[in-house]
């Protein structure tokens, strides 16, 4: 099996080596690990990161034999903002203008979200100690440097729970989120989990 992993970075330029210690343990168990380097928010706004993740999945499917991966057992995973990109790689279905590997699809067998920054529908404040809505926030920059407090439609566009309904085709999902997270509000994962259970 292959895990296409999206390194969290607040959608800024990634340090794609920062989780190699953890990922190497999965590799020791027989997983092929592919780490995605996406266009960061300083280059391209949402949904570029999710589209780049989709193209990475397609690349691994096409080159599965070369990397000794099973193209029928692909998973997408990510931590923090990478969890957001992993989720949206499966929520976005139309990316033909930026699909650079049309001979393969971007569907996976499962999504793994580790403390994913899945929503910006929550107000700033505890337990998160960060700014999530102002133009210079990671989320504001991800949407092109806008003040998200005045753009609820953009907040909905970028929030997982606002893009899921009973007809949304999603693979099985595994979510992790610590209750003492001070960067990404753990209530976000709870809301998404409850919505997924509902549907």
Located regions from the model:
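Alpha/beta-hydrolase superfamily serine-hydrolase fold, recognizing
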Residues: 1-199
